[in-house]
Amino acid sequence: MLRGAIFRPPRKAYGKVQLLMWKTRRINASPLMPEGLRIYAVGDVHGRADLLKQLFSRVDEDLKEYPIGETLHIFLGDYIDRGQDSAAVLDLLIERARTHRMSCLKGNHEFFLFEFLENPSVLKHWQQYGGLPTLASYGLTPITNADPKEQAELCARLWYALPKSHSQFLAGLKLFFTCGDFFFVHAGVRPGTPLSRQREEDLLWIRDEFLLHEKPFEKMIVHGHTPVMEPDVRNNRINIDTGAYATGRLTCLRLERDKIEFV
């Protein structure tokens, strides 16, 4: 008989009320990680370099207190936009990758940055998704209602301002990562379509069709993209986007064997 995987409250909870709610939660399935491996999965950062630094400190403390043979950091995308320090966030991730095993996924906001670099007219749409603070983080002066000439100039300046390390990091982002009984992705997956045949558009953008689906998927889906007030753990998915840019909460999911915890 499969026993339910335990959903443990975070060691540093957001509040007593949430902690009491989380203590009663349990998922019916029993998704497993490989023996001897611990994964730290992180939700949407959105330019909050300050919160990312704090999160790294929490993870380091956790590793010191509970050492394990192998660890993997997984970031679910949307490192940029909305918050004020997108460039600094990429610096932190690149630096962390020098000393830790990491897998960084692509989010829809990174998609917009790529689109802007290929087609400057996308700026008017990108700015609706919080793209102007990203330009500012690279020392550029954003223009709210830029005409085509100004859009092209901003695009050229961003190409020049973008460090090679950032370009390489962004070019290397993956659409998904799978490990054990878990499938990590930015937005979610389309129900009824095998995980091996998912479209990039859905992996980066899907919402209602995925969020309202209650039946099990091939694996437990760990995702971000849709902000929630607290981590949302369900029988078929775990949402760890807690709206960091607005709430000041950057969530880190800790997976080890059948344990589902937060740090």
Name what the model sees in each region:
Residues I6-L90:
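N-terminal active-site segment of His-dependent metallophosphoesterases
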Residues R26-E35, E65-Y66, L93-A97, L175-T178, ...:
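A short acidic-Thr-Gly-centered motif at the start of a beta-strand
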Residues V42-G43, I74-G77, C104-G107, M220-T226, ...:
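Active-site neighborhood of phospho(di)ester-bond hydrolases with catalytic His/Asp-centered motifs
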Residues H46-G47, D81, E110-F111, V189, ...:
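Short, glycine/acidic-enriched loop or turn micro-motifs at the edges of active sites
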Residues Y79-L93, E115-V122, D232-V233:
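Metal-dependent catalytic neighborhoods of phosphoester/phosphodiester hydrolases
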Residues V89-T99, S165-G172:
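Catalytic-core regions built around general acid/base machinery
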Residues H100-L135:
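Active-site HxH/HxHxD metal-binding segment of metal-dependent hydrolases
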Residues E118, Y129-N239, G243-R249, L255-V263:
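Acidic, His/Gly-enriched loop-helix segments that form or flank divalent-metal centers
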